[in-house]
């Protein structure tokens, strides 16, 4: 039986995480509005993320089934390593490809660096909402129901057992882990902004589709390495080490962009 104090502590940690995420998203919206001369770039960034996942997840499921199989691989095994490589590579291909598609079509008037930053903020915000904020809110509701027993009302024994397993897992959340999650989300936002600027540069350079595809190799590779290195080394260096590594890779990507940045041309005048 999970104690009331343990449930309350976990609920507090998730509440802290949800509040910090909301603050991060709202702050990003305010900044994007100032930098992007409105919310259109931010909104298109969000669309780019949703589009990337709508295309990536079915493809990832199919590739995983064909290459890896249906069984969950053991951490550290060759199959697990392959699954991490596939997940990281598809994230890079589909997310950077989606950014390029939107920036070269629907958002083709967005050419300033400020608009690129706003676009990256929108991409990161929707990712944070879907993958972190909504699960945190669900965890808060579930832990609250477990504390007063309402979540178990009228449940059959088998379902109650499965629910208890889930609640036991959620009750392990702590302020420390929540803080690490928020820190990771901040660096992920910085990474998304920087990768967007790389893609924006690639789109601005013109040429045909092959030229654009060739230029996208760099942001795809950077995205893949950021994800791949962190997850692959997680079993070896632990969660704290993995977060430090992710932060270091992100800062390296930012430094590389700054070093290679060319003056971005002014947006083309509207017809």
Regions of interest found by a model, annotated:
Residues 1-271:
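Hydrophobic alpha-helical segments at protein termini of multi-pass membrane proteins
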């Amino acid at each position: 039986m999970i104690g009331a104090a343990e449930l309350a502590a976990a609920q507090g940690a998730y509440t802290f995480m949800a509040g910090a995420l909301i603050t991060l998203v709202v702050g990003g919206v305010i900044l994007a509005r100032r930098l992007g001369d409105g919310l259109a770039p931010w909104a298109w960034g969000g669309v780019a993320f949703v589009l990337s996942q709508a295309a990536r997840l079915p493809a990832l499921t199919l590739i995983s089934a064909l290459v890896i199989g249906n069984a969950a691989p053991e951490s550290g095994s060759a199959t697990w390593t392959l699954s991490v490589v596939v997940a990281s590579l598809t994230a890079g291909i589909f997310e950077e490809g989606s950014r390029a598609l939107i920036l070269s079509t629907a958002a083709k008037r967005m050419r300033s660096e400020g608009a690129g930053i706003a676009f990256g903020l929108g991409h990161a915000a929707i990712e944070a909402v879907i993958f972190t904020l909504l699960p945190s809110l669900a965890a808060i509701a579930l832990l609250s129901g477990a504390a007063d027993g309402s979540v178990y009302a009228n449940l059959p024994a088998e379902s109650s057992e499965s629910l208890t397993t889930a609640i036991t897992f959620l009750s392990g959340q702590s302020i420390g882990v929540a803080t690490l999650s928020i820190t990771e989300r901040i660096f992920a936002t910085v990474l998304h902004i920087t990768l967007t600027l790389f893609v924006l540069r690639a789109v601005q350079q013109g040429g045909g589709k092959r030229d654009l595809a060739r230029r996208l190799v760099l942001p795809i590779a950077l995205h893949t390495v950021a994800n791949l290195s962190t997850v692959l080394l997680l079993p070896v260096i632990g969660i704290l080490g993995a977060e430090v590594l992710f932060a270091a890779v992100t800062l390296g990507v930012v430094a590389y962009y700054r070093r290679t940045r060319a003056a971005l041309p002014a947006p083309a005048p509207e017809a």
